[in-house]
UniProtKB/Swiss-Prot annotation:
It catalyses: Na(+)(in) + 2 H(+)(out) = Na(+)(out) + 2 H(+)(in). It is a multi-pass membrane protein. HAMAP family: NhaA. It comes from Streptomyces antibioticus. The keyword Disulfide bond does not apply. GO terms for molecular function: sodium:proton antiporter activity. The chain crosses the membrane at residues 34-54, 76-96, 113-133, 144-164, 174-194, 197-217, 223-243, 282-302, 312-332, 350-370, 381-401. Na(+)/H(+) antiporter that extrudes sodium in exchange for external protons. This is Na(+)/H(+) antiporter NhaA. The keyword Ion transport applies.
Length: 480
């Protein structure tokens, strides 16, 4: 006799998030969305400021104005302070995000982590490959291979806010995890490939400072007046070591504890991230964009973006490489692990998110400055290519996401519906008997109201009476 068929138990990928994870993602992305809009405003301001002849000189003067203690090796230009100083705050938050993902988020479970990690890695490797092939074919410089590898989550969310599209929580979490892993490998790329000379004395001091930072955290020492001065010292030593100073930010972020203990509502990492994220998204990143995105744009310059191998490689890497890398790896990973896409989503949704990830701005601009540090003209051309590629990726994503917007709106409404008004969306209470008892009580009251109205209408019809007050499902002017 044939053995009974085993039911299909294929693992679902990109399914609905747990309620705590959904709440965390929503809170994190809400701040990033506001920051993304500010980033967009700062970018437009920089482009206008740098391209109006009457204002162009003032932009250059402000960007190259130097200040800071020369004796400590910190007499830097405003643009330099923004790139090395303010972005350390951005990478500090990125470090906390990564730590949280590793100990309490999607990356905690190796099976769940495979998909976003593979997608992020391929989403960096394929753009780098596209850039390299373009420049080998066109006899250009391969120094900028890392420029199109990054995803800017804030800019991507700003695009979503502008076009009025709400992604389901699973897609938002996927995009956030992609960006977090992207940031991690971008940091490694900066540390490994863009560190030329190392001052080992300063590096040793920075490492010692990080050790003190870690020890104070483990001892439970509290107080910003302890950690902020120490963080500034570590940053200054890291800067003078020759290693990019933003590495100090991510290192300190990774040291924070992101798990809760008994009696704690939030972990120290979550608490500090909640305090610092608005500073990062609302001030640090927009100011970096203001002094980094101000490239002179002309018809000839835009034409060069599509003719010079270095700039064309950046554009193709962001628009084509990112999309193919993320979508292709996600599809192949699901196929070879015998996983199935959540029934709420389609592969077209993954393709749309992959194209949205082609918006590589903040980190791409930073790597562009590092890769072509000795060539001001090429640096500006690469910045223009980053802006152009990100704009094309945003337009492609807008079209793809708008096609699916009605479906997304329905999924978001399902995730937020709370008919029993207990503060928890109904989709998270389907297995809770108390929820069904509350819903049964609601429906019984609605049914009783319907019966009352029907009976009064019938009585009114027999006696030729007036209209019956009230409405089905209403009690005292409120839904039953």
């Amino acid at each position: 006799m044939a053995a009974p068929r085993t039911p299909n138990t294929a693992r679902k990928v990109l399914g609905r998030l747990s309620l705590p994870e959904r709440t965390f993602v929503a809170d994190a992305l809400r701040t990033e969305t506001v920051g993304g809009v500010l980033l967009l405003v700062a970018t437009v301001t920089a482009l206008v400021w740098a391209n109006i002849p009457a204002l162009q000189h003032s932009y250059e003067a402000v960007s190259h104005f130097h200040f800071g203690p020369s004796a400590l090796g910190l007499n830097l230009s405003v643009a330099h302070w923004a790139a090395d100083g303010l972005l350390a705050v951005f990478f500090f938050v990125a470090g906390i995000e990564l730590k949280r993902e590793l100990v309490a988020g999607d990356l905690r479970d190796p099976r769940a982590a495979v998909l976003p990690v593979v997608a992020a890695l391929c989403g960096m490797a394929v753009p780098a490959l596209v850039y390299t092939l373009t420049n080998l074919t066109g006899h250009g410089s391969t120094q900028g291979w890392a420029v199109p590898t990054a995803t800017d989550i804030a800019f991507a969310l700003a695009v979503l806010a502008v076009i009025g599209t709400s992604l389901p929580s699973a897609l938002r979490a996927f995009l956030l995890t992609l960006a977090v892993v992207d940031d991690l490998f971008a940091i490694l790329i900066i540390a490994i490939f863009f560190t030329e000379r190392i001052n080992f004395a300063a590096l040793g001091g920075a490492v010692a400072g990080l050790a003190v930072f870690w020890l104070l955290l483990r001892k439970g020492v509290r107080g910003w007046y302890v950690y902020v001065p120490l963080a500034v010292v570590v940053w200054a030593l890291m800067y003078n070591s020759g290693v990019h100073a933003t590495i100090a930010g991510v290192a300190m972020g990774l040291m924070l504890r992101c798990t809760t203990r008994e009696g704690e509502e939030h972990s120290p990492g979550e608490h500090i991230e909640h305090l610092v994220r608005p500073l990062s998204a609302g001030l640090a990143v927009p100011l970096f964009a203001l002094f980094s995105a101000g490239v002179v744009v002309s018809g000839g310059a835009l034409g060069d973006v599509f003719t010079e191998p270095e700039t064309l490689g950046v554009v193709l890497g962001l628009v084509v490489g990112k999309t193919l890398g993320i979508f292709g790896s996600t599809w192949l990973t699901a196929r070879f692990t015998h996983a199935e896409l959540s029934e709420d989503l389609e592969w077209a949704d993954i393709f749309a998110v992959a194209s949205l990830a082609g918006i590589g701005f903040t980190v791409s601009l930073l790597i562009g400055e590092l890769a072509f540090a000795g060539d001001t003209l090429l640096t500006d051309e690469v910045k223009a290519a980053v802006l152009t590629g990100s704009l094309i990726a945003a337009l492609c994503a807008t079209v793809l996401l708008k096609i699916r917007n009605a479906r997304y709106r329905g999924l978001c409404e399902d995730e937020e519906r709370d008919e029993d008004r207990d503060g928890i969306p109904d989709v998270y209470e389907q297995d809770d008997p108390a929820y069904h008892l509350r819903m049964a009580d609601i429906f019984e009251r609605k049914a009783a109201e319907h019966r009352r109205i029907a009976a009064e209408k019938a009585a009114a019809a027999r006696h030729g009476g007036a209209e019956v007050p009230g409405g089905a499902g209403e009690e005292d002017g409120r839904p039953a």
